[in-house]
Amino acid sequence: MSQTSQTRFIPHSPSPPVEWRIEPGLTPYEKALAFMEQRADAIRAGTAGEMVWLVEHPPLYTAGTSASPGDLLDPNRLPVYQTGRGGEYTYHGPGQRVAYVMLDLKRRREDVRAFVTALEDWIIASLARFNIRGERRQGRVGVWVARPEKSPLPDGTIMEDKIAAIGIRLRRWVSFHGIAVNVEPELAHFSGIVPCGISGFGVTSLVDLGLPVTMADFDVALKEAFEEVFGAAEPLFETDSLKRSA
């Protein structure tokens, strides 16, 4: 998908490719948070490069800085973690690709809103490789898919399901946290929360839409689309980042 100069986040000057890593297995959330904090600190200090870190988590809920307690509908269902990212409640679990995005926006563009738009563009371009039309909606951060086969909304408009969530944090213009795209998660767990504080809409995944996409398939698309929006990344391979220094 072609990107305009307004939505791309290519570095201003020649830079090393973004480090791109896939974590094997299920990553405990506490360890992921600690690693992100450490890596973001190192990027700010100039002792480490930018990084995109792909993980899956065991089933859990996270609460962003805007989370309302009333949106946690089933507090005893899964572990709940408070986190410093923006947004409200979301679910993470096996079959969902979480991409933690640790980029130095001083080297790109110091514009939070444009950065969120670029993350949405990245997801939309990734989904397009599987002929899925993902769309953004004003006032509903994330990526949405029209579901005309479902009952319409109360106002008669077409039902839409969320397929990807975005929740980021910036500290001195270095980003951490990131995006979560539903490849084949257990969608029933979303019923324990009001996802992202938005009621009245559904949640879907690539497999729920009838596409037998594997996580490996999606990772390839994710990397290709990332390079369209953010520039070059290292060759994709799997490693254990938690055993590496930041």
From Swiss-Prot:
Gene Ontology terms, MF aspect: lipoyl(octanoyl) transferase activity
UniProt cross-references to CDD domains, sorted A to Z: LipB
Keywords: Acyltransferase, Cytoplasm, Transferase
BPL/LPL catalytic domain residues: 46-234
GO biological process, one term: protein modification process
Localization, UniProt: Cytoplasm
Pfam family for this entry, one: LplA-B_cat
Protein name per UniProt: Octanoyltransferase
Name of the gene this protein is made from: lipB
